[in-house]
UniProtKB/Swiss-Prot annotation:
This is Ion-translocating oxidoreductase complex subunit E. Keywords: Cell inner membrane, Cell membrane, Electron transport, Membrane, Translocase, Transmembrane, Transmembrane helix, Transport. One of its GO terms (cellular component) is plasma membrane. The complex is composed of six subunits: RnfA, RnfB, RnfC, RnfD, RnfE and RnfG. It is a multi-pass membrane protein. It is found in: Cell inner membrane. GO terms for biological process: electron transport chain. The chain crosses the membrane at residues 18-38, 39-59, 69-89, 93-113, 125-145, 182-202. The gene is rnfE. It holds the Pfam family Rnf-Nqr. Part of a membrane-bound complex that couples electron transfer with translocation of ions across the membrane. Its EC number is 7.-.-.-. Belongs to the NqrDE/RnfAE family.
Amino acid sequence: MASHKELVKNGLWDNNPALVQLLGLCPLLAVSATVTNALGLGIATILVLVGSNLIVSLVRQWIPQEVRIPVFVMIIASLVTCVQLLMNAYAYGLYLSLGIFIPLIVTNCIIIGRAESFASKNDPLPAVLDGLWMGMGMTAVLVLLGAMREILGNGTLFDGADLLLGDWATMLRIELFHVDSHFLLAMLPPGAFLGVGFLIALKNVIDKKMADRQPKEKAEIERARIS
């Protein structure tokens, strides 16, 4: 069973679902035009990931191996429906903004992948922690990409935060610089592709520098034996 430290490291960095596994790219590219949209979808994904991992782990012994995938999809779809109804009730503006990408969480490969590869093979607590940190890793990338695109495209940060957090959150809006016309490349999917590529490249550079700092093991000297 993986330790909590390993789960945190895997979810946030070593096996990040967006930057390493390259899963969930459809919502990542489509919804991350602003920090608010990115954070809203990230929270919804975390809730579904944690819930599906917990339920799959609890019932894994009673699910026949032959039908496990359809059962996992039904569990995930039920949780997504609950999250969709909650968002419709308490964050209606964000619900309209995210649109079809909320129900499309059902088809997100991150969620079904964690249910199949981890939750179905581990106890409830590790499964919940795995879902939490994988979701946090995905949300972190969503928010970073959303911040990059919103700053470059609109010159703002946390625009529309009231859609997620309520009327008080209008004070969170920051205008970094004024733009007469939006930078469309940053706001459209091509800009999202470029942003994801930049984040992946940055992660690879950091990984390489960290690897270079590690002391390298000396190769063992093989001696020929003559008899």
